[in-house]
Amino acid sequence: MPKEVIERYRNSVPEEVIQIWEEYGLGSFLNGYLRVINPDDYKELVEETYFSGKESIPLFTTAFADVITWENNKYIGIIFYREEDFDIMASGIKYFFYDIYNEREFTDDYFDLKLYEKAVKKYGELEYNQSFCFFHY
């Protein structure tokens, strides 16, 4: 993660996010399903497509092109672009990370990990800047 990005968002995102950026930079976790992103790469998209976009900071994306945001300096939100929906996932980053690794119901509610595993098996692992997408005929 570029140092200027870290400094720009240092007082706007949780310290845990700053630590991830400083220690690991860009990358993925949850077997590649979630990606750590540069907020600047998604800020314009979120501002133009999400009613709360100007107050939201993009933090992560999913393998299905959903965007996870930091909202109102206290919530983790998710924008489900393929479903044209959004939700608040957690009240704080600590709860978000705890729930990802400890609450099956949480991941079932917000992430389609089974579909992701099937897609990876059929099409292979994604590159960092790729997502699985759905086409309506």
Can you say where each PLM-predicted feature lies in the sequence?
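Generic surface-pattern signal
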Residues: 7, 11, 22, 26, ...
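A surface-exposed partner-binding patch
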Residues: 1-78, 130-137
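Low-complexity intrinsically disordered segments
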Residues: 1, 111-137
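Context-gated lysine
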Residues: 3, 43, 54, 74, ...
